[in-house]
């Protein structure tokens, strides 16, 4: 069995954390190329970075204190996990194009094969799993 490629980073939640998380994720995706024998397709890479942005934005917006992001790759999928200090799970809204705001998790759920959120000691953990090569 192949060991997953992992990267974990802790953020303060201050200005610049979202850009730093995207940069970390972009570098992580670049590091996948040797394991995959090809880079992550451009459109899919952008979708992965969008999911990172949405999860990290929510952590910074709704949780006091620092948060941590872990990226892993195994079995053709990237898993993005964000831990934060709020025990409040993300709300699930019905799609509504007239609603202002609250679309982040809706976008994440649409792009990902699986999204889970659970309370853990000291806060919550949200994990999004995306197939790198989108199924036909």
Question: Where in this protein do the model-derived segments appear?
Answer:
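Conserved beta-strand-loop-beta-strand hairpin that lines the nucleotide-binding pocket
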Residues: 1-12, 60-136
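Short, structured helix-loop boundary elements
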Residues: 18, 41-45, 105
């Amino acid at each position: 069995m192949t060991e997953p490629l992992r990267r974990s980073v802790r953020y303060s939640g201050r200005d610049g954390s979202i850009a730093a998380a995207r940069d970390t994720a972009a570098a992580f995706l670049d590091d996948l190329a040797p394991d995959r024998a090809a880079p992550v397709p451009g459109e899919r890479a952008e979708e992965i970075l969008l999911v990172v942005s949405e999860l990290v934005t929510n952590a910074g917006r709704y949780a006091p204190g620092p948060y941590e992001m872990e990226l892993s790759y195994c079995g053709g999928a990237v898993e993005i996990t964000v831990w934060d200090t709020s025990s409040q799970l993300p709300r699930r809204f019905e799609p509504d194009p007239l609603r202002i705001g609250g679309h982040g998790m809706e976008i994440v759920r649409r792009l990902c094969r699986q999204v889970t959120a659970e309370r853990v000691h000291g806060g919550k953990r949200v994990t999004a799993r995306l197939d790198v090569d989108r199924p036909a």
